[in-house]
A protein has these predicted regions:
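PLP-dependent enzyme catalytic core of the Aspartate aminotransferase-like
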Residues: 97, 163, 179-230
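Short, small-residue-biased leader/transition segments that mark boundaries at the very start
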Residues: 1-3
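Active-site C-terminal subdomain of aminotransferase-like
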Residues: 12-146, 150-180, 185
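Short beta->alpha connector loops at strand-helix junctions that form conserved
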Residues: 6-9
Length: 230
C-alpha cells in the first residue's frame, strides 16, 4: 500500500469529539515513472517557487510534501489546537480501548448468532463468517467492535428493536466509547424502497451496532430485552 487516508474521528479519537483525518504516505511509489498521470507532482508548481515535488523530494517525500505545503495551504485543512489536543488524548488510550471494543464486538456477535430472532450476523471474527480466515491473518488481535445483523422479522422487527434499545444510542456514528446503533432503512437510506436497499447491500432488516466500552453483559442484556419485544 502506497498511501493510506484514515478518519481520526473514529477509533483514534474514540469519543465522538473530534473531526479530522490523517494521510500516511508509504513513500514507495515512483511518481516520475508515471509523470504523465501526475502532473501536479511531476511538473513545476508555479505557486511554490517552481518546485517539482517528485524531483526535489523523490518518491519518499513528494506526495506528503505537496499535501502539507501546497494543498493544506490552499484548502485550509488545518486542525484546531483543541482538536489536536483531544485527538492526542484519544491516541494515548487507543490500545486499551481497542481491546475492549473487539472483545465486546465478539461477545455481541456470538450472542446474536445464537438468537432465534436473528436471521444472520456479519462479523468476520465469527468462525461462520466467509471472511474469518482473512480476519485471522490480518486482524489477529481482534476484529473491531462493529457488528451488523439482520432480524428475521424484517423491516418491522428492525424498527421495534431500535425503539426498544435502552443503553445503545441511536445515531449514525461508529467507533465511539458509547454503543451506537443504526437501521439504515429508517435513517441514512430511508429514501430507498426494499429492492433498492437490498441492491445497495443494506436490506430493510439490517441493523448496524458499533459496540462501545460498556460491559459486554450490559450490552447483551439490552439487546436481549429489545429482541424480546419483537
Amino acid at each position: 500500500m502506497c498511501i493510506r487516508d484514515s478518519s481520526t474521528t473514529k477509533y483514534m479519537d474514540g469519543h465522538g469529539a473530534v473531526l479530522g483525518g490523517a494521510i500516511v504516505d508509504g513513500g514507495k511509489f515512483d511518481w516520475m515513472a508515471h509523470a504523465e498521470k501526475f502532473p501536479g507532482l511531476c511538473t513545476p508548481d508555479d505557486s511554490y517557487h517552481g518546485i517539482t515535488y517528485a524531483e526535489r523530494f523523490g518518491k519518499e517525500g513528494a506526495f506528503i510534501t505537496k499535501a502539507t505545503a501546497q494543498l493544506m495551504r490552499d484548502f485550509g485543512s488545518m486542525q484546531s489546537p483543541m482538536n489536536a489536543y483531544m485527538l492526542n488524548l484519544g491516541l494515548e488510550s487507543l490500545h486499551v480501548r481497542m481491546q475492549r471494543h473487539c472483545a465486546n464486538g465478539m461477545a455481541v456477535a456470538k450472542f446474536l448468532e445464537s438468537h432465534p430472532k436473528v436471521a444472520y450476523v456479519n462479523y468476520c471474527g465469527l468462525e461462520s463468517s466467509p471472511y474469518h480466515a482473512l480476519a485471522e491473518k490480518y486482524l489477529p488481535n481482534g476484529s473491531c467492535g462493529v457488528v451488523s445483523f439482520g432480524l428475521a422479522g424484517g423491516r418491522e422487527a428492525a424498527s421495534i428493536f431500535m425503539k426498544e434499545l435502552k443503553l445503545a444510542a441511536i445515531e449514525t456514528h461508529v467507533a465511539d466509547a458509547r454503543t451506537c446503533c443504526l437501521n439504515p432503512a429508517s435513517s441514512t437510506h430511508r429514501q430507498m424502497n426494499d429492492e433498492q436497499l437490498k441492491a445497495a447491500g443494506v436490506p430493510a432488516e439490517l441493523v448496524r451496532m458499533s459496540c462501545g466500552l460498556e460491559s459486554a453483559e450490559d450490552l447483551i442484556a439490552d439487546i436481549a430485552q429489545a429482541l424480546d419485544k419483537i
